[in-house]
Regions:
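Internal interaction segment
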Residues: 196-203, 221-285
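Bacterial signal peptide processing site
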Residues: 29-32
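Alpha-helical linker/edge segments of TPR/alpha-solenoid repeat scaffolds
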Residues: 79-109, 120-122
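N-terminal secretory signal peptides that target proteins for export/translocation
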Residues: 1-12
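Short, charge-rich amphipathic alpha-helical segments embedded
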Residues: 55-87
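C-terminal motif of bacterial Sec signal peptides marking the signal peptidase cleavage site
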Residues: 24-27
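Hydrophobic/aromatic side-chain positions at a characteristic register within alpha-helices
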Residues: 39, 46-47
């Protein structure tokens, strides 16, 4: 009787172990199936250009199924495909934006003369037709231009006044103002003396402008006073054409710089795409 009991107990234990093994096997198969489901959803999301959903599901495979090695490797390959697709999308979008800036530039360009002395200038400048250089030297004025690289500059000109000015201040009747940095004699600060007259020309290039051009662009519909600041101060009110010319130069500068930035970003995406494609084509070690 005791022997029969022992046999039944052994049989019961064997059945329990078998059931446990079956449960583990079922669990593993279930996990494997779920990992493949995540991978399938990621593949479908990639086909629909839904890159964030695809990446989220690939990341989930590594977290939820750390032992599903085949699916994790497949997810890595798929992630590379996603990165390539993202860069192709970015390049296409940037190309469309570059075309927009080209159209904008071509329209704005009509308001400018391109001036370049090939003997000593590598790059030329765009000069607003409203304030041509040839007709402004005999005036007390504030003219503008844009380098071929897109850098905006202002030039303050005093004709017949000797104050050694080195900076300017733009202000409106409500007290708002912007003031340039000081441009010293070792910069673009020129003083020309003839037999009958003294001319002062100071160029505020790049950061030297310190927001004066943007201030004039913003408040171009308001009266704007320019103060020439040196040993003493001289003031004048900008004419409508002076304000409009500076506003046009400000917009042209933004367009050129925007195109340059887009071209730079496109180059980065193209370089990354080439890297990903080379990495994919490289034979496994």
């Amino acid at each position: 009787m005791k022997m029969i009991f022992c046999n039944n107990k052994h049989k019961w234990r064997s059945q329990f172990v078998l059931i446990a093994i079956m449960l583990v096997a079922i669990s593993c198969n279930s996990n494997k199936k779920k990992a493949k489901d995540y991978l399938y959803i990621a593949e479908q999301a990639l086909e629909e250009n839904n890159f964030e959903v695809a990446k989220t599901h690939i990341d989930s495979i590594k977290i939820l199924f750390p032992k599903a090695f085949d699916d994790i490797r497949a997810g890595f390959d798929l992630m590379q495909d996603i990165r390539k697709a993202e860069n192709r999308r970015n390049i296409a979008y940037i190309d469309s934006m570059i075309n927009v800036t080209i159209d904008k530039f071509n329209e704005q360009r009509k308001n400018f003369d391109f001036v370049r002395d090939k003997n000593y200038q590598e790059f030329g400048n765009y000069i607003p037709k409203l304030t041509p250089s040839s007709s402004t030297l005999e005036q007390n004025t504030l003219r503008s231009g844009v380098s071929e690289k897109g850098v905006l500059y202002l030039e303050s000109i005093l004709s017949g006044l000797n104050i050694n000015h080195s900076k300017i201040k733009a202000s409106t009747p409500d007290g708002s103002y912007a003031e340039s940095l000081t441009v010293t004699a070792d910069g673009l600060n020129y003083k020309i003396t003839t037999r009958n007259k003294t001319y002062e020309i100071v160029r505020f290039f790049g950061n030297d402008d310190n927001g004066v051009a943007e201030f004039i662009y913003t408040f171009q519909e308001s009266p704007i006073t320019i103060n020439y600041i040196g040993r003493r101060s001289y003031s004048k009110t900008l004419s409508k054409n002076e304000k409009k010319a500076i506003a046009q130069a400000f917009e042209l500068s933004k367009t050129i710089l925007e195109r340059q930035n887009l071209t730079f970003e496109k180059g980065k995406s193209e370089a990354l795409l080439r890297y990903l494609e080379r990495d994919k084509a490289a034979p496994d070690n």
